[in-house]
């Protein structure tokens, strides 16, 4: 049995969970999330907690057991607390500005990048070098942060680019001139 999958998930008072056919619907203060569940997994709501089990005992069902338990846990956490990722822009002349649901990034190229912010995710700027991505869906928040970071990954010599706040960039030593 999956060590993560067999743990019950406690449901907070502010969260309502509904299981219909192969859908798990989680509603909370911040919003509503829906997750499709495979046929090999069953989800039950009992005594104020969610119990994830499996119908079959094959290898795939064992793998999905822990996965769906974690997905449901993240859904509950998302509708109660939400998720956020912070990014920092390093580099001379590198900056970001927000207009409506678009993020314009100047990253040392001749043109600006325009990143359209998808629904379900909000982006906040602190100054013009700090970006905070927030939302209730952990996957969407991480995906948006990764897409913004991929526009200009930090380079190892000067550290210029977009990096996560908790990310450590391994720096390299540049060329050293030979003395004659």
From Swiss-Prot:
Q: Which GO terms describe its cellular component?
A: cytosolic large ribosomal subunit
Domain of life of the source: Bacteria
Q: Does the keyword Disulfide bond apply?
A: no
For this protein, the record's PANTHER family field holds: 60S/50S RIBOSOMAL PROTEIN L6/L9, LARGE RIBOSOMAL SUBUNIT PROTEIN UL6M
Function description? This protein binds to the 23S rRNA, and is important in its secondary structure. It is located near the subunit interface in the base of the L7/L12 stalk, and near the tRNA binding site of the peptidyltransferase center.
- State whether it acts alone or in a complex, and with which partners, per the record: Part of the 50S ribosomal subunit.
For this entry, the protein name equals: Large ribosomal subunit protein uL6
The record lists the lineage as: Bacteria, Pseudomonadati, Spirochaetota, Spirochaetia, Spirochaetales
